[in-house]
Amino acid sequence: TEIQAQTIIISTGATAKYLGLPSEQRLRGGGVSACAVCDGFFYKGQEVAIVGGGDTAAEEATYLAKICSKVTILVRKEQMRASKVMQHRVTNTPNIDLKYNTEIDEVLGQQVVEGLRMKNNATGTIEEIPITGLFIAIGHKPNTDIFKSQIDMDDSGYIITHGKTTKTNLPGVFASGDVQDKDYRQAVTAAGTGCMAALDAERYLAGLE
């Protein structure tokens, strides 16, 4: 189908990356989430875990530590790749437990998350812990494949917008939401840039008259 228009707003979003475990996929919506800010309040006073070693994982862990009784961070490598500031914040939060060289073998539970079976990839040791929530913080993939070679993007595939606007490198083409935002990724910020894109598009169309 071909649709002709004088202006376009791209708002195809970004998709959270998951581990790909069958048990993880089965329990999405039953305790497995990719957004601590969205779903963290469901686990007030409970024990949860986060998978990831970057700034996002560290930020979500410190956020969850304020409302959950215990937060376990599972880092696949021997150290976090988060900034030194975030690493310091994590290690100085008493109810955060860091487990390095650790990967999930299976998410335990049938209808809801009840625990984790983990494997230390350095020693081969298997361990199980009880949790009620699992947060995946290993990044997002912007849904921009269809725009490759047409729209300017950064190395991660996020659309580059210019200055404080939603303008792209193509006149009349604007981008809003998670497709151009790798930092905030919230519904309210996406809605805000959507409003900005609509205003930018309106001004562009007015300039064509």
Language model: regions and residue ranges:
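Small-residue-rich anion-binding loops in enzyme active sites
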Residues: 1-12
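A Rossmann-like FAD-binding core segment of flavoenzymes
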Residues: 2-3, 65-163, 170, 203-209
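A structural signal for the hydrophobic beta-strands that form the central parallel beta-sheet
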Residues: 10, 34, 98-100, 130, ...
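Redox-cofactor binding/interface segments in oxidoreductases and associated redox assembly factors
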Residues: 10-11, 50, 136-137
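FAD-site-proximal beta/loop scaffold in flavoenzymes
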Residues: 15, 20, 25-42, 138-184, ...
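Glycine-rich Rossmann-fold phosphate-binding loop(s) that bind the pyrophosphate
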Residues: 52-54
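N-terminal Rossmann-fold NAD(P) dinucleotide-binding loop
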Residues: 57-58
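Generic hydrophobic/aromatic pocket-lining and core-packing "Φ" positions
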Residues: 61-62
